[in-house]
């Protein structure tokens, strides 16, 4: 990885987060490839299963899993305590980390690894998701009310990938 304004400690933490994100992405893609009809895990985060929407999610995770997270550029110069991270969708592979990121666990709900999935889904080449809602409750509600937006929501991708608590 390339680091901008990151201490040695934070570089180590980012290497671990990148590794976790790579695992999450690979596992999400593997799951989608082996579950091509409705499952609790899919419908919880993306709503009613229809093939066209499934194919969109599959495309997103296929792209995300082909990223090498350890080759991203990580910028540690943001100190906003209320923000995890942000990207410019057209500037592929450049992620700015903020205060909330450093307080997150490496894996699990709202984790560092999951944050990198969230941010990578915003990159245009990975699907260009938006932020329609934040949080698990919001994402689950969106899946029920508007699956078309759920498949375009970054947190929905993060929670599907983190799969915590685990859903079949």
From Swiss-Prot:
What biological-process GO terms show up in the record? proteolysis
* Reactions mediated catalytically: Preferential cleavage in proteins: -Xaa-|-Lys- (in which Xaa may be Pro)
Keywords on record: Disulfide bond, Hydrolase, Metal-binding, Metalloprotease, Protease, Secreted, Zinc
Supply one GO molecular-function term.
metal ion binding
- What residues form the membrane-spanning segments? none
Q: How is it regulated at the activity level?
A: Inhibited by chelating agents such as EDTA and 1,10-phenanthroline.
UniProt key word Metal-binding: yes
* Disulfide bonding pattern of the chain: 6-76, 78-98
Any one cellular-component term (Gene Ontology) = extracellular region
The residues the record assigns to binding Zn(2+) are 118, 122, 131
Q: What class of enzyme is it?
A: hydrolase
Any idea where this protein resides? Secreted
Q: How is the cofactor bound?
A: Binds 1 zinc ion per subunit.
Site described as Transition state stabilizer, positions?
134
For activity, the cofactor(s) needed are: Zn(2+)
Residues of the active site are 119
EC numbers listed for it are 3.4.24.20
User: PANTHER family in the record, alphabetically?
Assistant: NEUTRAL PROTEASE 2-RELATED (PTHR37016:SF3), PTHR37016
**Family, per the entry?**
Belongs to the peptidase M35 family.
Q: What is this protein called?
A: Peptidyl-Lys metalloendopeptidase
This chain's source organism reads: Pleurotus ostreatus
What gene makes this protein?
Answer: MEP
């Amino acid at each position: 990885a390339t680091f901008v304004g990151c201490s040695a400690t934070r570089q180590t933490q980012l290497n671990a987060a990148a590794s976790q994100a790579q695992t999450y992405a690979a596992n999400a893609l593997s799951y989608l490839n082996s579950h091509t009809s409705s499952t609790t895990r899919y419908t919880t985060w993306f709503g009613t299963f229809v093939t066209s929407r499934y194919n969109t999610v599959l495309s997103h995770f296929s792209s995300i899993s082909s990223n090498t997270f350890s080759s991203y550029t990580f910028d540690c110069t943001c100190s906003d305590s209320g923000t995890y991270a942000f990207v410019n969708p057209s500037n592929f592979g450049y992620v700015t980390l903020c205060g909330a990121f450093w307080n997150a666990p490496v894996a699990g709900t709202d984790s560092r690894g999951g944050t990198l999935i969230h941010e990578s889904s915003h990159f245009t080449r990975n699907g260009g998701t938006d932020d329609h809602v934040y949080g698990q409750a919001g994402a689950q509600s969106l899946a029920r009310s508007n699956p078309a937006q759920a498949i375009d929501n970054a947190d929905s991708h993060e929670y599907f990938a983190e799969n915590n608590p685990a859903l079949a």
